[in-house]
Structure formats: C-alpha cells, structure tokens
Amino acid sequence: MDQIILQDPELAQAIILESGRQIDKLELIASENIASTAVREAQSTILTNKYAEGYPGKRYYGGCEYVDIAENLAIERAKALFHSEYANVQPHSGSQANMGAYFALIKPRDTILGMNLSHGGHLTHGSPVNFSGRLFNIVSYGVNKETGLIDYEEVAKLAEKHKPQLIVAGASAYPRIIDFSKFRSIADTIGAKLLVDMAHIAGLVATNLHPSPIPYAHITTTTTHKTLRGPRGGMILSTEDMGKVINSQIFPGIQGGPLMHVIAAKAVALGEASKASFVTYQKQVILNAKTLAKQLLDAGFNLVSGGTDNHLLLIDLTNKKITGKDAEKALDQAGITVNKNTVPFETLSPFVTSGIRIGTPALTTRGLCEQDMIKVANWIVTALNNINNETQLKEINKEVTYFARQFPLFSW
C-alpha cells in the first residue's frame, strides 16, 4: 500500500476504509469469501504486464514461456481437483464462463431450460435483462411451492413440452443438494445437452461434500471465488473431446488476452483447495450454516426449503412483515452484511424483495465455529426484531465490532 498512499491518496483512503469494513463487520453474503494472502500476492504480481492471447504452447505473442507455466499449473490442478479431463481457466468471470459454454453447445435463438431467477437461479440462466435472455429462447423451471425444493417433475414436463436444446442446472440461491443425475436423465430423454453452473458449490464439490456434476454434465462452469476461495474469475470443465470447441468460444470467441495474474492466483487457490485443511474448512462451512439455520428457525423465521444442505440460507421475511431491503439496511447498521434476495413466488420488486440470502464461507474463513454462529444468529434476530430502533442497532454494532476484531480476516 505504500506506493498507493504516496501516488493516489484518494484511492488509498477507499482501500483503507474497505479494509476496516471487512475487519469490523460480519460478512454473510453467500457469494463472498476472503482470499488468502498467497492468492492476493499472486494476483498483484508482474504477470499483470503480460499479454498472452491463445493457449499454452499456442500463443499469438512471444515471451509467453513463463506465463505458460502458470496457466498449465492452474489447468492441471483444476483437472485433478475436480476429476475432469479438461479445464479452461481463462474466463474472466462466471458469466463469461457461461457465455462461452452456451456458444459451445447451442446457437442463438435455441431454447434453454433454466432455473427461474426468483426461485434461486442466476441472471445468466435466462433473465430477460441478461445476454442469455436476449440471445436465446428461455423457459424457466422452479421449486415446489410447498417444499421449496426443485420440482424435477416440472422440469421433466417442461423439457418434454418445449424440447430445449440445453438444460441448465445450478443456482445462486438454492440451499439444498441438487440431483445432477436426474437432470442428465431428463436431458437425455429429449436429446438436450446439460450444463451445470456450480459456482456457489464448487468448494463443496471439490471436497466431496456435494455430489459432483462432472460425470453428468456435458459442460460444467464455475467461479473461482465463493466457496472455492480464490480470486474473482471463472473456469470451465468438460471432457477432452469438448476442449477444442470450448477453447475457441472463449478465445477468440468472447475474450481477447487472458488475465495472467488472475490465472496465477487461480493456480494458488486450486493448490490450496487440494489440501486436507480445505476439507476441514468446507465441513465447517456447512456446520456453521446448519447452526445458523437452526437458530433462526427456532426464533420463528421462515427458511426456504426449511433449512440448508450447503453454505447458504434463504430467509423469507413475509411472516415478519419486513422487506429484504429494510432487513439488509438494518443488519448493515448492526454491523452484519447480507443481501436482499427474491424468494420463490416473489411478489415484490427485485429492488425490494421479500427475503435475504446469507452464507457462511467468509465467516468460516475467519475462524468462526458453531458456538460463534449462535451469537451471530442472536444478533440477527435482535436486529430484525428492532429494525426501526436505531439505539438497539447501534448497540449491536458495538458488540459485533468488538467480536469481529477477535478474528483475523484469514485464519486457515
């Protein structure tokens, strides 16, 4: 930071303030995590200077012999970690990984059957405001209204009726195990391809705490942050025979030069994820989520699907007569960061919402365990029961700040 402070004090101030926010607040946004010092060091290296259009051994620029080493390390580690024949580590984000995968499997105006955004899907699974909804014909499936679980019978019926060329499984706000074998069976019945977006659960899949989609999906995409705890970026996994077409759809299809400093950081994160300590970490992520779920259920809060099998919970606040927007604001005042989130069969705008999504990856990285999550749950309950009581929220904030400062940002 020394050079930033000297050369750009305005930016330095923003970074310092953000550092303080991350230290002093409890991060419960399910898609966020805390990268290790090694990951961040790799991302800030001199590799950022190097253009490397193409792939290892087949570049359009000279001088790529050392960045080739970095990219090959990331590729081989990804393949080993997920037991995949092929890996592309160049996508700049999960959205670009999905875009490249779509173009590798189908054509514009083809039909995609994907999960409804308000039921837990993702923008890139067919939202009309996203490229996926603009370039492709979209049919959406959802969850059962009574159980909150993916309605596989509905998926099968919609597939039979609309004959999509591609079925997308995976979610951004679904707290239960996904049965990829059922999705593949449905896809095979109608001759469709199956894409699995495992961005949220990649860390759990890597440690065998969630069934792997690799044996079932024609292509699997993921981000490299979230539960995988790496730099922000994307990745594609598939069979060797799909490699050539996927590579061409990423470069030159939708990207130019890869970000070699980020790819180096991906290599570091994938190496970290192969260690025994990462398995212990992921187990704790789930234990913490289940503890949080139990405490909130006991306090009278409604959880979509009644609980969680993974790293996140989706809280429907309708019975509390609180909007997600107001809950997010109150919790932020109390020192707890969450995001407002639509819930299945949502009646409010996505800028207001009826729910909040919370997750445990970041707090688990800081070293919190089940006992600590009971405290966190109590603060959440108290804050949401007093959303208009600024004095109470400020008091919680003081307690949260003192508590949070007992934990380093990265403890693994």
Swiss-Prot record:
Cofactor(s) the record lists? pyridoxal 5'-phosphate
Instruction: Report the GO molecular function annotations.
Output: glycine hydroxymethyltransferase activity; pyridoxal phosphate binding
User: Keywords of this protein's UniProt record, alphabetized?
Assistant: Amino-acid biosynthesis, Cytoplasm, One-carbon metabolism, Pyridoxal phosphate, Transferase
Metal-binding found in the keyword field:
no
Q: Which GO BP terms, alphabetically?
A: glycine biosynthetic process from serine; tetrahydrofolate interconversion
Positions carrying N6-(pyridoxal phosphate)lysine are 226
| Gene Ontology cellular-component terms listed | cytosol
Which reaction equation describes what this protein catalyses?
A: (6R)-5,10-methylene-5,6,7,8-tetrahydrofolate + glycine + H2O = (6S)-5,6,7,8-tetrahydrofolate + L-serine
Class of the enzyme per the UniProt entry, highest EC level: transferase
Chain positions of site Plays an important role in substrate specificity: 225
Q: Where in the cell is it found?
A: Cytoplasm
In Pfam terms, one family for this protein is SHMT
Task: Tell me which EC number(s) this protein carries.
Answer: 2.1.2.1
Q: Under which pathway is this protein filed? A: One-carbon metabolism; tetrahydrofolate interconversion; Amino-acid biosynthesis; glycine biosynthesis; glycine from L-serine: step 1/1
Briefly state the protein's biological role. Answer: Catalyzes the reversible interconversion of serine and glycine with tetrahydrofolate (THF) serving as the one-carbon carrier. This reaction serves as the major source of one-carbon groups required for the biosynthesis of purines, thymidylate, methionine, and other important biomolecules. Also exhibits THF-independent aldolase activity toward beta-hydroxyamino acids, producing glycine and aldehydes, via a retro-aldol mechanism.
The UniProt family comment states: Belongs to the SHMT family.
Complexes and interactors: Homodimer.
Identify this protein by name: Serine hydroxymethyltransferase
Q: Which organism is it from?
A: Lawsonia intracellularis (strain PHE/MN1-00)
